[in-house]
């Protein structure tokens, strides 16, 4: 994992970064304020990662490892994009309902990256705890899987980021 990617990932996983922000809402029985996914993807013989996170303020970010000098690509979104904000809010809401089905660690614990390409780690963060679960992406695409809504909303959010990026690229052309 490239350091620039790890830095952005760790920023989102450290709930202390939200301490001085007004309007944070803690959701569900475990009072989460951040949720997201991390995917491992094969790029030839190298594994690269994609990280999507949102918080209860409506902020969302997408980061991914790439071949640039910094090794990091990404975009920040949510504000001004109602569809993205709605999908991200649904992802956060579904994550809050699944914390009892996830592994639980003390807040500040290092979140393990997905085990292998094709695997997805879903996570939720509260002031006291880091919740996470890992599944093969093919499992999460099954509508009967308990984490399907969480994953499906993450994929919608990713799609809105892609659309946002495409609009930005065409506007700059």
Task: List PLM regions with ranges.
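Short, well-ordered, aromatic-rich surface patches in folded extracellular/luminal domains
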Residues: 1-39, 114-173
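A short, surface-exposed interaction/processing loop segment used at functional sites
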Residues: 58-79, 155-169
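Long, charged/polar, surface-exposed segments that mediate recognition or autoinhibition
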Residues: 67-101
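Surface-exposed, interaction-prone regions used to assemble/regulate multi-protein complexes
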Residues: 95-98, 109, 122-124
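Charged/polar positions within long, soluble alpha-helices
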Residues: 96, 100-103, 129, 134
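Surface-exposed patches in mature extracellular/periplasmic domains of secreted proteins
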Residues: 102-112
């Amino acid at each position: 994992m490239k350091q620039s990617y790890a830095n952005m990932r760790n920023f989102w996983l450290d709930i202390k970064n939200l301490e001085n922000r007004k309007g944070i809402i803690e959701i569900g029985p475990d009072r989460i304020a951040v949720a997201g996914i991390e995917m491992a993807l094969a790029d030839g013989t190298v594994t690269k990662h994609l990280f999507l996170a949102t918080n209860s303020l409506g902020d969302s970010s997408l980061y991914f490892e790439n071949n640039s000098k910094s090794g990091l690509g990404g975009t920040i979104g949510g504000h001004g994009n109602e569809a993205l904000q709605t999908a991200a809010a649904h992802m956060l809401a579904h994550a809050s309902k699944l914390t009892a089905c996830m592994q639980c660690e003390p807040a500040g614990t290092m979140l393990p990256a997905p085990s292998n390409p094709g695997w997805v780690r879903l996570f939720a963060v509260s002031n006291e705890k880091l919740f996470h679960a890992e599944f093969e992406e093919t499992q999460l695409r099954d509508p009967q899987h308990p984490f399907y809504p969480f994953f499906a909303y993450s994929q919608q959010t990713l799609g809105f980021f892609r659309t946002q990026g495409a609009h930005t690229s065409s506007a700059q052309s």
